[in-house]
Amino acid sequence: MNSMNPMKPALPPAPHGDGSFAYESVPWQQSATQPAGSLSVVTTVWGVGNATQSQVLGNPMGPAGSPSGSSMMPGVAGGSSALTSPQCLGQQAFAEGGANKGYVQQGVYSRGGYPGAPGFTTGYAGGPGGLGLPSHAARPSTDFTQAAAAAAVAAAAATATATATATVAALQEKQSQELSQYGAMGAGQSFNSQFLQHGGPRGPSVPAGMNPTGIGGVMGPSGLSPLAMNPTRAAGMTPLYAGQRLPQHGYPGPPQAQPLPRQGVKRTYSEVYPGQQYLQGGQYAPSTAQFAPSPGQPPAPSPSYPGHRLPLQQGMTQSLSVPGPTGLHYKPTEQFNGQGASFNGGSVSYSQPGLSGPTRSIPGYPSSPLPGNPTPPMTPSSSVPYMSPNQEVKSPFLPDLKPNLNSLHSSPSGSGPCDELRLTFPVRDGVVLEPFRLQHNLAVSNHVFQLRDSVYKTLIMRPDLELQFKCYHHEDRQMNTNWPASVQVSVNATPLTIERGDNKTSHKPLYLKHVCQPGRNTIQITVTACCCSHLFVLQLVHRPSVRSVLQGLLKKRLLPAEHCITKIKRNFSSGTIPGTPGPNGEDGVEQTAIKVSLKCPITFRRIQLPARGHDCRHIQCFDLESYLQLNCERGTWRCPVCNKTALLEGLEVDQYMLGILIYIQNSDYEEITIDPTCSWKPVPVKPDMHIKEEPDGPALKRCRTVSPAHVLMPSVMEMIAALGPGAAPFAPLQPPSVPAPSDYPGQGSSFLGPGTFPESFPPTTPSTPTLAEFTPGPPPISYQSDIPSSLLTSEKSTACLPSQMAPAGHLDPTHNPGTPGLHTSNLGAPPGPQLHHSNPPPASRQSLGQASLGPTGELAFSPATGVMGPPSMSGAGEAPEPALDLLPELTNPDELLSYLGPPDLPTNNNDDLLSLFENN
């Protein structure tokens, strides 16, 4: 018999090995003393035997898959009469708590004292695959329908790992009968026929009837067929499992009497449940060993229950090698599938109700068509590296966790920590590898770059910084990501999955910092066809989360209602409000009223935060968050209403429209009309035309950050209400002539750029369009923050952008003293630091001339030369690259940066992202 060891090489060491518990194959020692009748259940790992199904079936493998003759647990089976007694066999190593369908076949071997005493008798009640090991094909859910089934599944995982040694003598008689029963192992059926088939060869060969799952059944005796286990496993395996060897299934390889060495048995279960040693001393240690007394606990060979048992098996990685009482120790993986698979103490009641679900096949491992012939694991390609079984033990296995087939190291392209949507901006002089072409017809090329320790640490600590590697067509001036189909990339020997999407415009760049290391890094590019038409570039990029940008814009670009009104009136008076659907929209024709939709032109749902570009001449707004999300992947930054360029730093949040939206937020209105005096009224919805909006909103609205109602002061809402239907316009605006403290310190002042809002702008008469010309370009960035100090302070302490989002409540003016009035006496004051707000949040004030950068140094890099060592390219020509000089400039440092982070950190405009990179 070939021991399973030879297969060992097939299992690459798990990348996440447990250190001392390497996948060492632990040979099962066979004790000469073991009675021929005893059989052991062993789960073997990926060793693939040549044995065919018949072989497997023929071998009277113990439940563990070891030949019945050999005692997998030498110590246990060997001399221990206890095990020998049928009782022991009866106990299933693991109670399959599953659906209560443990392999409870009471009967045959159940040991009286053993709680749950169901014996192994129950084959894996899996139905055709007595073992419940679905053959490679997915096991029909019905397989597990039997009472034993559900539990079996769960238990199977567990049981597969436990070795049950017991005498089979008594069973022999039934064996032949039961084999036939395998297919339908009823709860009452005994495992014995299968697992116990002792009698050596006598084990009946499994009839085809065993069938796919039969295989599994067969496996029981001979060892679970690897794949059989797989399929189910596979899915369940999730990448975690996928990579792992499926330890449990003994591959039918070794003939019966031979002990199957446990390959891949990684750690003794004892680590986890030391006390529970199955088969301890030949008997289940009564104390802990008893796996859930749930109904029969099937012996170890778990049939491949779809994925569920996988975990056990893995977790079980028991070192069967331990002779003697140790038997297998199960490390229960915490709940498997999170479904009740908790091994209580020793109870492995895996209740996996879902087991019946279709089995999932493990990616990377072919399923072998013949039940008896396990297919050796294929070397997982870039997709799923072998993973250490431990992982399961560490975290509960969620019920239907699907493996991420992309790869362990798939690049987090569009999503950063917290899976937040992120915008991407190049950092000036942040190019690490200048755009390069591949050498003609060079299949594999290596490109080396250096990362200093300080740079590496900064990258890792800052979720908003990334190393972006992308490919683009040489004629594309926009450098939009486009990956030729034949390109494959790996970094430091870690294959990366390229997201190409459905069309060439949806390709995504790779983000490499998670696979980089301090010092030398190598990008290996493999192509199967010439890619001379494309260029590759590696650059540092700033990737702030949409939430942080949204917050920055709310603070810096919330255009006060009075200014919005003035702007609208000016546009009415000029007779040019392009892009609005109202009547008489032609230039030079006086407009009486304009219809404005309350729906975002991007999502066609009610706008939450109304915004426009600074240069837009229309009243119609779009939803700010939807617009930011729209520009996450390929930032075109064009207004969806008029198609003018609307860059991030030029966006304005319209407080007037926001007030209207809040005022009618609980109604179904879809449009309003606005007249030249800025009075507004809702347009009634025609009942037959109206389709109620879905309450949950569009998919884009995932990061709804703040409740817009909290952004407006009560006085603003009074003004909006006054402008609404039936109210005297502007009435509420008179009182503000007395400056009221406001946490929107100087709404106007924040826009007082040179010539932007003249000092003559009278706070008490917003209706007069005295706002001189709006400066053609976006106002300077150093706007004072326009939101309550509570929000500002909450951000000061946060270092990670995703966490900077203050709860919506923080924006609620009622939480901040001094927020009552919208107007401040400073509206007419000259721009600059001398703007004194009645209630300035001390820490948040800074002179207008200073760019605001967050405490995290959001995008602040001070000039650092040679931060990244000279990158060199090898393979496509070893031309060394000059050292990368990261200059102190960002794409629009004065304009962009202050929007992206909290404004608490005064920094020089010359500072930029690279300031975080140390020079040493």
Swiss-Prot record:
Composition bias (Pro residues) maps to 295-304, 366-379
InterPro entries assigned to the protein according to its UniProt record, in alphabetical order: Znf_MIZ, Znf_RING/FYVE/PHD
Q: Where is the composition biased (Polar residues)?
A: 334-354, 906-920
Region annotation Interaction with AR: where it falls in the sequence: 435-506
Location of the protein in the cell: Nucleus
> Modified residue Asymmetric dimethylarginine is at which positions?
R245, R262
Q: Which GO terms describe its molecular function?
A: SUMO ligase activity; transcription coactivator activity; zinc ion binding
Question: Which residues does this entry mark as bearing Omega-N-methylarginine?
Answer: R111
Tissue pattern of expression reads: Expressed most abundantly in testis with lower levels in heart, brain, pancreas, prostate and ovary.
Q: Where is the composition biased (Low complexity)?
A: 60-79, 380-389, 876-890
What are the record keywords, sorted?
Answer: Isopeptide bond, Metal-binding, Methylation, Nucleus, Transcription, Transcription regulation, Ubl conjugation, Zinc, Zinc-finger
Q: Name the predominant localization.
A: nucleus
Q: What is one Gene Ontology biological process annotated in the Swiss-Prot or TrEMBL record? A: positive regulation of transcription by RNA polymerase II
> Disordered: where is this region?
1-22, 54-79, 243-265, 286-391, 803-920
**Which residues form the SP-RING-type zinc fingers?**
585-671
Instruction: From the record heading this protein, give the residue positions of the covalent cross-link Glycyl lysine isopeptide (Lys-Gly) (interchain with G-Cter in SUMO2).
Output: K402, K457, K692
For this protein, the record's Pfam families field holds: zf-MIZ
Q: How does it assemble?
A: Interacts with AR, SMARCA4/BRG1 and SMARCE1/BAF57. Interaction with either SMARCA4 and SMARCE1 enhances AR-mediated transcription.
User: Which PANTHER family does its entry note?
Assistant: ZINC FINGER MIZ DOMAIN-CONTAINING PROTEIN (PTHR10782), ZINC FINGER MIZ DOMAIN-CONTAINING PROTEIN 2 (PTHR10782:SF38)
Task: Please state what the protein is called.
Answer: Zinc finger MIZ domain-containing protein 2
Organism equals Homo sapiens (Human)
Gene name per UniProt: ZMIZ2
